[in-house]
Amino acid sequence: VIRPILLLVALSFPVFAQTTQEKVREYRRANEWPLLREYFELLSLPNVASDNQNIRRNAARIMEMMKQRGLDPRLLEADTPNTPPAVYAEWKTPGAQRTLLFYAHYDGQPTDPKQWTRTLPWEPVFRTAAIEAGGQIVSDAGPPVSTPINPQWRIYARSASDDKAGVMAILSAFAALKAKGIALNSNIKFFFEGEEEAGSPHLTEIIKKHKDLLAADTWIICDGPVHQSGRKQVVFGARGDTNVDVKVYAAKRPLHSGHYGNWSPNPAMMLARLLASMKDEEGRVTIDGWYSDVEPLGEAELRAIADAPKYDEELKKQLGLKRVEGGGKSLMELINVPSLNINGFGSGDIGALARNVIPTTASAVLDLRLVKGNDHNRQTQRLVDYIKKQGYHVIDREPTDAERAQYPLIARVNVRPGGYNAERTRMDLPISVAVIEAVQSTAPDKIVLLPTSGGSLPLSIITENLRTVTISVPIANYDNNQHAENENIRLQNLWDGIETFAALMTIK
């Protein structure tokens, strides 16, 4: 008599099967400390692309992480000596009709350790919150395993967000799916680059050399932050980028500013005037043709911009800005036009080393961000032509005495190697829709769709050489200080990233 009653009671209540997201979250919660210990080990390795010995230590460590997850990794080398290798692995799914390749990069920006607050770039620590919000170091020696993990804690270290977080989230998502026995619907490939922050100068070489291995229907890119509102976002393009060094000249030796001021030209003034003339008061670039070849946004892209959260006023408050550029356009709109930025400017000395002299030279590094339709070679040529129109004799080396005697204004202009164009994928493609649905399934709020990221990635190199499409799914907190001192990742963003990539690996 008891059994039928129990059966009836059981049938009277709904039975809920765990979703993929719930299973992945269960795995993560059970393995938080092992995952974090593994991540701290990776973050403790210096990872500037020019440091070949340490960059290869990073690659070796990532290979070990892959092996522990049942993958068979290998290094993809370029033919150029001392090039940082890419780390590659794949997982074949029987019967799969689609191949997804997950991209992140393991190198980081150079940094000055003296600029970090109480910590060093490659000595990761937990803080209770962002430094700007009064976050305190949990323990200089690292918290004990018994300490409850607060998802609002942040890990401070170089590349904690950009972009070792991508490596960690992707590999942890794969581990969770495998541990929980969740079937994949696609062949999965992993590609972790080692010199993205150096401009990916050898990515084309690596891709061409290993073209068959890197073939995929879609490259899913993990790099960059979520929207400033905190919502998850899917980004369908990235700006191109190229960097240019500009140097102008005055007297051949430093001159006493009292004896020679008002007579000898000051190169700092010369360069300041030249650079200031390149933009108007609203920040619009005045160089001829700068915007002429921009490819217009389509209806879907314009709708996505209109639907995105309006966050400019809040950003102005956070950043202490009363006035911004752009002539009244939103940040989201301005990301989709080419820009010209001064990365750095130098002439003479300041601070304790300041002297009453007229310097001999002044130098600046310019950052040209490109959008779909721009060509990086054409854009840099426009810059050179503009400098010539301002009366400068342009060369690509140090001037000779004869040139100094002949030309009153001389500018050395050098375009740095590794420039690349912008790329953008249509938002209405079937794979685009599938990615949007997968990411949305893991988010409590409506996700943000961006036609183009403000940051740059070498997506055009990928699409041009492999005839594939790229879609970016960033996971880092927007206030992560990427490229700057005190870089950090909020733990909840890392945890959310694991669930997001698990959803992408199981799209139908």
Predicted feature descriptions by range:
Residues 172-179, 273-277, 368, 503-506:
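Short glycine/serine- and small hydrophobic-enriched flexible loop segments
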Residues 147-237, 310:
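Acidic/histidine-rich catalytic neighborhood of metal-dependent amide-processing enzymes
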Residues 3, 153-168, 261, 265, ...:
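Short, conserved micro-motifs enriched in small and acidic residues
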Residues 165-176, 270-273, 434, 461, ...:
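Short amphipathic alpha-helical face segments that pack within enzyme cores
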Residues 95, 228-229, 291-353, 374-385, ...:
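An extended, acidic, His-containing surface patch that forms the Zn2+-binding/catalytic region
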Residues 18-160, 180-184:
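Acidic/His- and Gly-rich active-site-bordering loop/insert found
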